[in-house]
């Protein structure tokens, strides 16, 4: 998994 993906998911959600 990518760190950027985690924060990105929170922003999109």
Swiss-Prot record:
Subcellular location: Secreted
Main localization of the protein described in the UniProt heading: secreted
Superkingdom as given in the UniProt entry: Eukaryota
Tissue: Expressed by the skin glands.
InterPro entries, sorted: Bombesin
An annotated Gene Ontology molecular function: hormone activity
Keywords, sorted A to Z: Amidation, Amphibian defense peptide, Pyrrolidone carboxylic acid, Secreted
Residue positions where Methionine amide is found in the record: 13
One GO location term (cellular component): extracellular region
Swiss-Prot/TrEMBL GO biological process terms: defense response; neuropeptide signaling pathway; regulation of insulin secretion
UniProt modified residues of type Pyrrolidone carboxylic acid: 1
Family note: Belongs to the bombesin/neuromedin-B/ranatensin family.
Function: Possesses insulin-releasing activity.
Protein name (database record): Bombesin-like peptide 1
Species of origin: Bombina variegata (Yellow-bellied toad)
